[in-house]
């Protein structure tokens, strides 16, 4: 790791349809081989499906799904005297968002529906209702942190 100053954060522009920067981050994470227009159409079509399925504002549903997946604590490995402990650590706000986005996309890709927009819509709808693989991933992370609460004094 460089000892110079940290790299400056790039400004992320809001998306075209909703004017939301978090949605742009989501699209950027979904994008494969630089095909942003494909990622945009997948996300917008998925949000339309979520709107018809849940009968509510698509952006509001997206943010609720993201909030339901965001972890508050995670475990990090810490070596102390030859033993490696899983130390529970609170997750920074930026990382919470990044993890939630990553987990939602990974969970959607693993689903069995035919198209990616169907999978993404189903996963977002499930996350809105506190179900689904992405929410389970958050629960598992919290359980791990809770199980290793005894090592929380090893924080750094």
UniProtKB/Swiss-Prot annotation:
Keyword rRNA-binding: yes
InterPro entries: Ribosomal_uS7, Ribosomal_uS7_bac/org-type, Ribosomal_uS7_CS, Ribosomal_uS7_dom, Ribosomal_uS7_dom_sf
One of the Pfam families matching this protein, by short name: Ribosomal_S7
The keyword RNA-binding belongs to this UniProt entry's keyword annotation: yes
Keywords per UniProt: Ribonucleoprotein, Ribosomal protein, RNA-binding, rRNA-binding, tRNA-binding
Cellular-component GO terms for this entry: small ribosomal subunit
GO biological process: translation
A molecular function GO annotation: tRNA binding
Assembly information from the UniProt record: Part of the 30S ribosomal subunit. Contacts proteins S9 and S11.
Family as reported in the entry's similarity comment: Belongs to the universal ribosomal protein uS7 family.
Function: One of the primary rRNA binding proteins, it binds directly to 16S rRNA where it nucleates assembly of the head domain of the 30S subunit. Is located at the subunit interface close to the decoding center, probably blocks exit of the E-site tRNA.
UniProt xrefs under HAMAP family: Ribosomal_uS7_B
Name of this chain's protein: Small ribosomal subunit protein uS7
Organism encoding this protein: Cereibacter sphaeroides (strain ATCC 17023 / DSM 158 / JCM 6121 / CCUG 31486 / LMG 2827 / NBRC 12203 / NCIMB 8253 / ATH 2.4.1.)
Gene: rpsG
């Amino acid at each position: 790791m460089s000892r110079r100053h940290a790299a400056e954060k790039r400004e992320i522009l809001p998306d075209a349809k909703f004017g939301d920067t978090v949605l742009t981050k989501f699209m950027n994470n979904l994008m494969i081989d630089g095909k942003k227009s494909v990622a945009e159409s997948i996300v917008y079509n998925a949000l339309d499906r979520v709107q018809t399925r849940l009968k509510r504002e698509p952006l509001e549903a997206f943010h609720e799904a993201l909030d339901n997946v965001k972890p508050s604590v995670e475990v990090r490995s810490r070596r102390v005297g030859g033993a490696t402990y899983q130390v529970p650590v609170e997750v920074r706000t930026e990382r919470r968002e990044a993890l939630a986005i990553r987990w939602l996309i990974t969970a959607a890709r693993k689903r069995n529906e035919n198209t990616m927009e169907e999978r993404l819509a189903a996963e977002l709808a499930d996350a809105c209702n506190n179900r689904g693989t992405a929410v389970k991933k958050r629960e598992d992370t919290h359980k791990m942190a809770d199980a290793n609460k005894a090592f929380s004094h090893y924080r750094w």
